[in-house]
From Swiss-Prot:
Pfam families, per the entry: AAA_18 (PF13238)
Gene3D superfamilies to which the protein is assigned, alphabetical: P-loop containing nucleotide triphosphate hydrolases
Enzyme Commission code(s) on record: 2.7.4.3
Family: Belongs to the adenylate kinase family. AK6 subfamily.
Single GO MF descriptor: adenylate kinase activity
Catalytic activity from the UniProt record: AMP + ATP = 2 ADP; ATP + H2O = ADP + phosphate + H(+)
Protein name according to UniProt: Putative adenylate kinase
Keyword Cell inner membrane in record: no
Region (LID): 99-109
GO biological process entries: ribosomal small subunit biogenesis; rRNA processing
């Protein structure tokens, strides 16, 4: 089974993906590292630009029939059996990205993406089985336990549980207006 863990930068993808893979006994794959290793994409202005179609094809070929947790904000473009879209309060994302040294424009772009569900919408356009999980105020262990419970119960689709419209005013200073 291929489980893709995706979300806006700063939601906890890597932490959750590694823990989920460990709990399930699955292989963990960081998509950025995988793309670099396979020569998929190129560096442009200090960012790796990845050809999503090439990534999807190579990943599908290399991991077909394997149990894998794929970690990356492009993982929802893979042919996955299940896509987990991690969400977090946009203000929390802003704080985390600021700590990581993100510039104002990139920070604003990602806060806005979380605020208006960009990753979730993309995931739903690409996949049938999408589960949305709000990580706000939860430990990584709690998030993984929630995911495992949903998987055990056979839940393949759970979306629409997050609405950040009430925090819009709080994140306004971070947005690129």
């Amino acid at each position: 089974m291929i489980i893709a863990v995706t979300g806006t930068p700063g939601v906890g993808k890597t932490t959750i993906s590694k823990l989920l893979a460990e709990k399930l006994g699955y292989e963990y794959v960081n998509l950025r590292d995988y793309a670099l290793e396979k020569g998929i994409g190129e560096m442009k202005e200090n960012e790796l630009e990845i050809d999503v179609d090439e990534l999807r094809e190579a990943f599908g070929r290399d991991f077909k029939g394997k149990n894998v947790v794929a970690d990356g904000h492009l993982s929802h473009f893979l042919k996955a059996d299940l896509v987990i879209v991690l969400r977090a309060n946009p203000k929390l994302i802003a704080e985390r990205l600021k700590e990581r040294g993100y510039g104002r424009e990139k920070l604003g772009e990602n806060v806005e993406a979380e605020l208006v569900d960009v990753i979730l919408v993309e995931a739903l356009e690409e996949n049938e089985n999408v589960i949305e999980v709000d990580t706000t105020g939860k430990t990584p262990e709690e998030v993984v336990e929630e995911i495992l419970n949903l998987i055990r119960r056979g839940v393949k689709r759970r979306v629409g549980i997050v609405d950040w419209s009430e925090v819009y005013d709080e994140v306004l200073p971070y947005l690129r207006l």
